[in-house]
A protein has these predicted regions:
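Positively charged, low-complexity/disordered segments
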Residues: 219-230
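Short, flexible helix-loop junctions that flank or precede catalytic/ligand sites
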Residues: 1-217
Length: 230
């Protein structure tokens, strides 16, 4: 992008659209201009991929609205928002089974019975991980797919916490916290990482206690699929 040479977002988009691409990938949406460009590209019928820096998936919708994009455009052009965090993996060379404390689980909105049969792990520290107990990273995701319930909430200008409640109660959104619990229960990451990276987000905890039984069953089923529960 070089405005002095007339290489602007709008001009570049016109040239890209003329090439009839299947997917348009844009850089980070930081301001109203880049947001409008992304929306205009989506209005041409093309699939547009871009990025935000937000706390969670609902934050992406809020960011577009705060950039003064028309509500009806946000509701009609956005198909999905994916939030992710990177959590450290326990070192495979020194990881050992760990039984999480009742207090640690309850601080995350869970009871021991919700994760019965899971295989939590924690690295003890070794030369291969430089005595950190961790090696590599794994992503936890929150995938918000817009349907008629969410589009209606956006058009009716519901506040962010109401949009998030709708996404959880009516659309079955699995939050970053819940996805992290499933991965921790399968030894992919640790509860310490979950608390450090994810659970500090207040919005990540909305309604999590209400859904802990359902997620607990999902954890146990995933463990069965992996052959960890006989």
């Amino acid at each position: 992008i070089n405005p002095k040479l007339n290489v602007t977002f709008e001009e570049t988009l016109r040239h890209i659209v003329r090439q009839d691409p299947d997917i348009i990938v844009m850089g980070e949406i930081r301001d109203r201009l880049s947001a409008e460009t992304a929306v205009e590209a989506a209005l041409t019928g093309h699939k547009v991929l871009s990025t935000f820096h937000t706390e969670d998936s609902v934050g992406g919708l809020v960011r577009l609205i705060n950039m003064e994009i028309e509500i009806y455009l946000v509701a009609s052009t956005v198909s999905a928002v994916i939030a992710q965090r990177l959590l450290r993996r326990p070192c495979p060379a020194c990881a050992a089974p760990e039984k999480p404390s009742v207090g640690a689980l309850r601080r995350l909105g869970y009871n021991p019975s919700d994760v019965h049969g899971s295989e939590f792990k924690k690295g003890r520290g070794c030369p291969k991980c430089r005595y950190t107990g961790y090696k590599g990273r794994a992503a936890v995701h929150e995938i918000l797919i817009l349907d008629e319930h969410l589009r209606s909430a956006i058009i009716n200008r519901k506040p962010p916490h109401e949009i998030r409640r709708t996404s959880i109660e009516q659309c079955g959104l699995v939050t970053l916290l819940e996805d992290g619990i499933v991965k921790a229960a399968n030894g992919i990451t640790t509860l310490d990482e979950e608390r450090l990276v994810v659970s500090d987000s207040a919005s990540a905890r909305v309604n999590v206690i209400r859904f802990n039984r359902e997620i607990g069953r999902a954890v146990q089923q995933e463990c069965r699929d992996r052959g960890s529960i006989s």
